[in-house]
């Protein structure tokens, strides 16, 4: 029995002897940066049933031979509710049995039945990826397929967070170049001629079958060896984060297919597993066990507002300089002509160096969101902001003892989509030249409306007797007390942000200030996302009434403020949602 | 200057009074903040405006900087904005435009003020869209100058018939060639200032008369 | 206290239709003698003067002079709501111009007055050597004729004829009218077509327009009510041709 | 088998002009008694009811009840093609509503019926304490008057007057009409101007509108044909003001 | 030297209204016999022929044949400026077509002639087996009827009836007219609705249209002046349905 510490990089589960085993992939950053896979066999999946008749429900559930039943007191949209916590033996049992449970006469509804097992673990244990964990465990022999430098530990005690965030993570970027003389690259016939790799681990190289006169080129015999050398580098370096640009939809699927054709082994996972590409909606997602693969392309689409998202365009926007560009449809000519090939090598290296620079700039915020939302970086980097906000609320609901609403049904989703809340107030600007202009802005208008008016689905009421805040224009009523779930959560976020900003002011350490600044930036993004979620059609806490009330109050506040400003001699010449410009007329 | 400060002080103290009043009535956590004081400004539409703070111009959505503008366009725009925002005189802005247009028409502008700079970011043979900078770069190559990816091409548009692209010449070769007044007036100077002027109530026709050299008089001369 | 009543709202409507396309805001001076307005457009190209005498109104009370600043666009929106047989009543209260139409129903509109510093322009002192009258409709037709080829119009007057003309890229247009008046000195000047269109919206004010013209001088257009109780006039700055 | 003939197509046109701006699709119930329609707009703000009795038609045959679902926009396109002297004949076949206009030529239009599940809304049960009549055109004029300043309208009725009013940023408008009816309890409510405009497209149905009004209650507007053979009515939900 | 005078400008206007929506530029042949024009639209779907005999004009002089090429859009702009009682005078000078309207004022317009190579199209030789007459207005109404459901129109003629019809996604339309003429061989063909709309702008030329129709053959539409002094005719290529 030993104490272990490691930064949690990734998480999944496997089945061993019919038992689900949570696997925690991490590195001992305090020690020698050793990779560790920790196994936790103590966790079981569960869902909640809301009974119409508690005793009858317990009786009916007994007959289903479930692992364990437990009556709990929870809240459903604020209302105290007795629920039955139903534990299963294995995560795969949940989808098989939940419909039978839902259909029982004595069951009104089931909840939290579609939360992936590994996410459930992170939520219930209150641990978050990219933070340091500590636990007691016993080191065991690794399975034969596990790479030799990885230690396997069986968790025996409680897994908890030390509260220390990870810094100085190892990042490696990669990019492939394909020789495709006939249109779009086709992995069935167009070979990969180069793979570039670069990172903050003192490594910048292009692996290829040619170019031995160039000092940054590592020459290999053929394409198969090229692929195996790339795999070797990843396994050997074991970066915490492997980044590509459009690598989910292009580089990794292409590599995988070429490797299959050539018979090359690409067992990049810590456990010896292969690269695995999954469908996620309309996109792909490529996972490597233990190494977090981040595709920067979707991250940049979310982060920036540009006309195009080519690597060149993004790089120019971030760093204000141009990088080397070659026409994609004619790269093969550069490869085929000796006098042009060196330029292709420089271009390939430039691609991975640029990708790495982008990663260094943009990943800190994503790491901070990872810690806040509490889901793996692999997932966070592929989530829309609304999804991030939703998983944040799921985590908070667990802490508050609040049942998580189900996702909308298909018909609910369809009917919701047609509706849109009216936006903020805009006063079209007065044309012409104005003198002595003052600019006023509300600080966090919408979040503070949610908090001060207690806008939440659980506080929304038809009860005329309750003491309520009543929304302008629509007349929706929100109980003044108790504090609603979402207002409470937003209040926490804003308070935490204020605390961090105070801490920044009091710190003399530039590195600490930088870290704190990223933290407050992440909180700001989360808070800004939070007020819009009521209007997202797929959102579990969707409420058109709440969304409409927020903007209605927003319009009301700014209009009243403009009117009051007139009394003080300020004439508004232009207003937009949460701010206005006014001239002083005495 | 002291008169200006006095006005500003009065306004800022009224701002303080107003904010104190309004914030005392807002819910906790909500706050109306003072974001800035500007001597002058104009708004075109939402998200499109220009303001001046001391001698610094704050502009949004007005396309104030485009990399393919010649110095004469940038300078004229800057002067126009200053006339409007610092001096408070749209009329002075019109005079600036009229004066610049007149100098361009008379051939009275130095070549340095007419040079357009553009960076070449790929092989010349790979450009699908053959813009003026590509034509000028090719002409430079033909003269034996080195032009490669990353090079800055400096060219002017000369007089003549045909598309603008075909009249792009490297500035090194343009000595003695006459520049095209219509191009520099319409595509450079007027393009740089017309949106600003229209936001102040000047119509397209007013701007056309400025660029044509024909002048719409005002009644001021008759008062 | 100000109150003015009128059986025919058209006079107000036709006047302000022209005025609102020239200026966004006007100051109207109310006095015992009547209602008066002088305004200069933003670019100082067009000047407009309106005078409606107290005698024009069926009932007129103005026991102390008053100046009100009105948004012309808002005013026009209200005046357009008048019906043919409505009686219109104008008055003011603290902060509003009140317009009431009495017909089948009583319809009351309040237009917010604008609180601005307003310096009333004085009309420029211009001596003209000639003056002639043309049918208003002929003037409107000439503008529409020239509009198909050009955005500027040349006005000429000689001893016999008033001529409006223009030359464009695709064609030319010319309108000749025998004015039958004494013209001592021929004159010629060029004007913006759009600016003249704005002035000519006042087509119910009078059936004829009095024109004063001089070489490269502002155009003066005057509309007088047959009853002499109202006058609407405009000055339009010329366009000066470039030196070649 | 269903067949209905009418000498005057205007009744159909004016009814469906209003209905089509409120709902995209309607179910029309055809029976021996006549033609009936109840519909609720998508946002559940406006309810519309139409009844055209068999007696209204010159010839009417409906030997078994039928429900047809029609796209109102397509129906309006056809009805707009009627000429003043056309005789209009309505019938159905498998999958179509057939409209025929007989005049100088015979013009036949077939509109595809819609195959949807349609739950006919029931009118809400509302008790009103007062009812009064106003000229339809006055109502239309009031809407246009208020439109220049506001997007909502306040209706009030007291023992003497019906008042429509609004206050906007740039001005106010108010229309007063002496209704000459007995009103037991004054009432006041606010409505969306756009929604009322939709209802008032039915201006050839009747020269007067019957209004039921209650404090913060839906507006009920009823148009009855002089012959009693048809009725078109609307319910419009009020806008609720926030407590200050 | 060419000069033509006409008391009624409407003939010119209605002719060129149709022509200008079909072709951008036309060549007009001026000769002692009169004015003639043949044009084929850019996509070679519609052919138009206009003939205005010298006798149509009150005064007509053309002492040597001349061909002028005119932009139809510019010509229409000028013709639209004619007033009901204007006398219109056409002439040419070096580079311009001159149109003068004499009324209360003399209004002179010069339209720049176009300097282009122009090959006058010859009308295709087509034999038709049948011919019938329909009121022009009925044709226009049919187009508007079919427009609500379709962008193509089927014309059929049999021994008794002329039928215009179309089937669309949302409905069908059919117009039947008893023509009362001898038809030897029934015919059917489909045409583009937009193209027919262009032709039917010439609605003041004649009250009736003569139609020649054949199976999948071009539609021939002829408008003859009652006085026989002018003729405007069109040929429209059919739409050929794909083999099923
Ligand atoms: Mg790539
Ligand atoms: Mg690349």
Swiss-Prot record, chain A:
Catalytic reactions of this protein:
DNA(n) + a 2'-deoxyribonucleoside 5'-triphosphate = DNA(n+1) + diphosphate
Q: Which GO terms describe its biological process?
A: DNA-templated DNA replication
User: Per the record, a Pfam family?
Assistant: DNA_pol_B_exo1
Q: Which cysteines are joined by disulfide bonds?
A: none
Q: What class of enzyme is it?
A: transferase
Activity regulation note:
DNA polymerase is inhibited by replication protein A (RPA), while 3'-5' exonuclease activity is not. Polymerase inhibition can be overcome by replication factor C (RFC) and PCNA.
| SMART domains associated with the record | POLBc
Give EC number(s), comma-separated.
Answer: 2.7.7.7
Query: What does the annotation record about activity and temperature?
Result: Optimum temperature for DNA polymerase is 60 degrees Celsius, functional between 60 and 80 degrees Celsius. Exonuclease activity is higher at 70 than 50 degrees Celsius.
Q: Which InterPro entries match?
A: DNA-dir_DNA_pol_B, DNA-dir_DNA_pol_B_CS, DNA-dir_DNA_pol_B_exonuc, DNA-dir_DNA_pol_B_multi_dom, DNA/RNA_pol_sf, DNA_pol_palm_dom_sf, DNA_pol_type-B, RNaseH-like_sf
Q: Which UniProt keywords apply?
A: DNA replication, DNA-binding, DNA-directed DNA polymerase, Exonuclease, Hydrolase, Nuclease, Nucleotidyltransferase, Transferase
Q: State the Gene Ontology terms under molecular function.
A: DNA binding; DNA-directed DNA polymerase activity; exonuclease activity; nucleotide binding
Protein family: Belongs to the DNA polymerase type-B family.
Q: How does it assemble?
A: Formed of a complex between PolB1 and PolB2; the exonuclease activity is associated with subunit 1. Probably binds replication protein A (RPA).
One further remark on this entry is: In some Methanobacteriaceae the PolB protein is split over 2 genes.
Task: Report the protein's function.
Answer: In addition to polymerase activity, this DNA polymerase exhibits 3'-5' exonuclease activity.
- Under which name does UniProt file this protein? DNA polymerase PolB subunit 1
Swiss-Prot record, chain B:
Source domain of life:
Archaea
**GO function terms (MF aspect):** DNA binding; DNA-directed DNA polymerase activity; exonuclease activity; nucleotide binding
User: How is activity regulated here?
Assistant: DNA polymerase is inhibited by replication protein A (RPA), while 3'-5' exonuclease activity is not. Polymerase inhibition can be overcome by replication factor C (RFC) and PCNA.
Gene (name only) = polB2
Q: Which PANTHER family match?
A: DNA POLYMERASE CATALYTIC SUBUNIT (PTHR10322), DNA POLYMERASE DELTA CATALYTIC SUBUNIT (PTHR10322:SF23)
Q: Which SUPFAM superfamilies match?
A: DNA/RNA polymerases (SSF56672)
Q: Does the keyword Ligase apply?
A: no
| Name of this chain's protein | DNA polymerase PolB subunit 2
Instruction: Please describe what this protein does.
Output: In addition to polymerase activity, this DNA polymerase exhibits 3'-5' exonuclease activity.
Q: By its UniProt entry, which InterPro entries does this protein fall under?
A: DNA-dir_DNA_pol_B_multi_dom, DNA/RNA_pol_sf, DNA_pol_B_thumb, DNA_pol_palm_dom_sf, DNA_pol_type-B
Q: What else is known?
A: In some Methanobacteriaceae the PolB protein is split over 2 genes.
The record's keywords, sorted A to Z, are:
DNA replication, DNA-binding, DNA-directed DNA polymerase, Exonuclease, Hydrolase, Nuclease, Nucleotidyltransferase, Transferase
Swiss-Prot record, chains C, D, E:
Q: List the PROSITE patterns.
A: PCNA_1
A GO BP annotation: leading strand elongation
Q: Which InterPro entries match?
A: DNA_clamp_sf (IPR046938), Pr_cel_nuc_antig (IPR000730), Pr_cel_nuc_antig_CS (IPR022659), Pr_cel_nuc_antig_N (IPR022648)
Q: Name one GO molecular function term.
A: DNA polymerase processivity factor activity
According to the record, the signal peptide region is none
**Alphabetized UniProt keyword annotations:** DNA replication, DNA-binding
DNA-binding listed as a keyword:
yes
Q: Which HAMAP family match?
A: DNApol_clamp_arch
> What NCBIfam families does the database record attribute to this sequence?
pcna, PRK01115.1-5
The UniProt similarity line reads: Belongs to the PCNA family.
What functional role does this protein have? Sliding clamp subunit that acts as a moving platform for DNA processing. Responsible for tethering the catalytic subunit of DNA polymerase to DNA during high-speed replication. In conjunction with replication factor C (RFC) stimulates DNA synthesis by PolB, relieving inhibition by replication protein A (RPA).
Name of the protein: DNA polymerase sliding clamp
- Look up and give the organism this protein is from: Methanothermobacter thermautotrophicus (strain ATCC 29096 / DSM 1053 / JCM 10044 / NBRC 100330 / Delta H)
* Gene it is expressed from: pcn
């Amino acid at each position: 029995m030993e104490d272990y510490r490691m930064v949690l990089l990734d998480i999944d589960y496997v089945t061993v002897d019919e038992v689900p085993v949570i696997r925690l992939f991490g590195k001992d950053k305090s020690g020698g940066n050793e990779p560790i896979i920790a196994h936790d066999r103590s966790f079981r999946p569960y869902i909640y049933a809301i009974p119409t008749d508690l005793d009858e429900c317990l009786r009916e559930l007994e007959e289903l031979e479930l692992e364990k039943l437990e009556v709990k007191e929870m809240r459903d949209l604020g209302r105290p509710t007795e629920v039955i916590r139903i534990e299963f033996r294995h995560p795969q049992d949940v989808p098989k049995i939940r419909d039978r449970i839902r259909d029982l006469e004595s069951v009104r509804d089931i909840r939290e039945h579609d939360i992936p097992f590994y996410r459930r673990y992170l939520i219930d244990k209150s641990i978050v990826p990219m933070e340091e964990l500590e636990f007691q465990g016993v080191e065991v022999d690794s399975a034969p397929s596990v790479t030799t430098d990885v230690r396997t530990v069986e968790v025996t005690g409680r897994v908890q967070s030390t509260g220390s965030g990870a810094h100085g993570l190892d990042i490696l970027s990669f990019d492939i170049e394909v020789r495709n003389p006939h249109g779009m690259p086709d992995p069935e016939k167009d070979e990969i001629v180069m793979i570039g790799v670069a990172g903050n681990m003192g490594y910048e190289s292009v692996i290829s079958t040619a170019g031995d006169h160039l000092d940054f080129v590592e020459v290999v015999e053929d394409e198969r060896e090229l692929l195996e050398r790339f795999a070797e580098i990843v396994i050997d370096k074991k970066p915490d984060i492997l980044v590509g640009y459009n690598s989910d939809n292009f580089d990794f699927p292409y590599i995988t297919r070429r490797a299959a054709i050539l018979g090359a082994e690409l067992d990049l996972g810590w456990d010896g597993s292969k690269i695995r590409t999954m469908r996620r909606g309309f996109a792909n997602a490529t996972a490597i066990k233990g190494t977090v693969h981040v595709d920067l392309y979707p991250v940049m689409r979310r982060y920036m507002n540009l006309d195009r998202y080519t690597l060149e365009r993004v790089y120019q926007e971030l760093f204000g300089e141009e990088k080397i560009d070659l026409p994609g449809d004619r790269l093969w000519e550069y490869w085929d002509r000796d006098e042009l090939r060196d330029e292709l090598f420089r271009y390939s290296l430039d691609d991975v160096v640029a990708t790495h620079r982008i990663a260094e700039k943009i990943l800190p915020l994503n790491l901070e969101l990872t810690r806040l939302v509490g889901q793996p970086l692999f997932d966070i980097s592929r989530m829309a902001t609304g999804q991030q906000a939703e998983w944040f609320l799921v985590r908070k609901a667990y802490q508050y003892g609040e049942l998580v609403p189900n996702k909308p049904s298909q018909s609910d989703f369809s009917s919701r989509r047609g509706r849109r809340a009216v936006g903020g107030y805009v006063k079209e600007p007065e044309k012409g030249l104005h003198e002595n202009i003052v600019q006023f802005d509300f600080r966090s208008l919408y979040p503070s409306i949610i908090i001060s008016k207690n806008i939440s689905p659980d506080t929304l009421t038809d009860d005329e007797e309750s003491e309520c805040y009543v929304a302008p224009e629509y007349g929706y009523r929100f109980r003044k007390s108790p504090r609603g779930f979402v207002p409470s959560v937003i209040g926490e976020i804003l308070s935490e942000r204020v605390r961090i900003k105070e801490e920044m002011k009091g710190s003399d350490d530039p590195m600490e200030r930088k870290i704190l600044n990223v933290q407050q930036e992440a909180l700001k993004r989360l808070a800004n996302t939070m007020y819009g979620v009521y209007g997202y059609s797929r959102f579990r806490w969707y409420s058109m009434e709440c969304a409409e009330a927020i903007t209605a109050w927003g319009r009301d506040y700014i209009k009243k403020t403009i009117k009051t400003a007139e009394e003080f001699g300020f004439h508004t010449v232009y207003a937009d949602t949460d701010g206005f410009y006014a001239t002083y007329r005495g | 200057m002291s008169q200006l400060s006095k006005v500003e002080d009065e306004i800022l103290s009224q701002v303080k009074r107003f904010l104190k009043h309004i914030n005392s009535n807002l819910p906790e956590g909500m706050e109306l903040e003072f974001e800035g004081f500007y001597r002058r400004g104009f708004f075109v539409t939402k998200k499109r405006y220009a303001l001046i703070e001391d001698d610094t111009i704050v502009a949004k959505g007005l396309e104030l900087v485009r990399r393919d503008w010649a110095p004469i366009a940038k300078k004229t725009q800057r002067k126009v904005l200053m006339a409007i925002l610092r001096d408070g005189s749209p009329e002075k802005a019109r005079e600036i435009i009229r004066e610049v247009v007149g100098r361009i028409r008379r051939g009275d502008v130095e070549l340095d003020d007419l040079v357009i700079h553009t960076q070449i970011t790929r092989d010349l043979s790979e450009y699908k869209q053959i813009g003026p900078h590509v034509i000028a770069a090719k002409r430079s190559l033909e003269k034996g100058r080195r032009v490669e990816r990353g090079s800055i091409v400096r060219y002017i548009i000369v007089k003549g018939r045909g598309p603008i692209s075909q009249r792009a010449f490297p500035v090194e070769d343009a000595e003695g060639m006459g520049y095209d007044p219509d191009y520099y007036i319409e595509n450079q100077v007027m393009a740089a200032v017309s949106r600003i002027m229209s936001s102040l109530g000047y119509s397209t026709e007013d701007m056309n008369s400025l660029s044509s050299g024909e002048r719409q008089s005002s009644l001021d001369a008759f008062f | 206290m100000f109150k003015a009543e009128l059986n025919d709202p058209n006079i107000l409507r036709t006047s302000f239709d022209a005025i609102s396309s020239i200026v966004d805001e006007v100051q109207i001076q109310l006095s015992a003698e009547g209602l008066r307005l002088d305004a200069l457009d933003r670019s100082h190209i067009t000047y407009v003067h309106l005078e409606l005498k107290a005698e024009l109104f069926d009932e007129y009370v103005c026991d102390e002079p008053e100046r009100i600043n009105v948004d012309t666009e808002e005013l026009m929106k209200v005046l357009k709501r008048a019906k043919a047989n409505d009686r219109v009543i104008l008055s003011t209260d603290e902060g509003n111009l009140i317009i009431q139409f009495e017909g089948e129903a009583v319809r009351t509109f309040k237009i917010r007055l604008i609180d601005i510093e307003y310096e009333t322009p004085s009309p420029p002192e211009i001596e003209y050597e000639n003056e002639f009258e043309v049918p208003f409709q002929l003037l409107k037709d000439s503008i529409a004729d020239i509009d198909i080829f050009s955005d500027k119009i040349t006005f000429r007057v000689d001893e016999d004829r008033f001529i409006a003309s223009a030359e464009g890229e695709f064609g030319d247009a010319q309108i000749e009218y025998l004015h039958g008046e004494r013209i001592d000195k021929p004159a010629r000047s060029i004007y913006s077509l759009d600016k003249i269109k704005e002035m000519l919206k006042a087509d119910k004010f009078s059936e004829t327009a009095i024109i004063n013209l001089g070489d490269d001088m502002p155009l003066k257009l005057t509309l007088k009510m047959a009853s002499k109780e109202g006058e609407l006039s405009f000055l339009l700055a010329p366009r000066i041709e470039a030196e070649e």
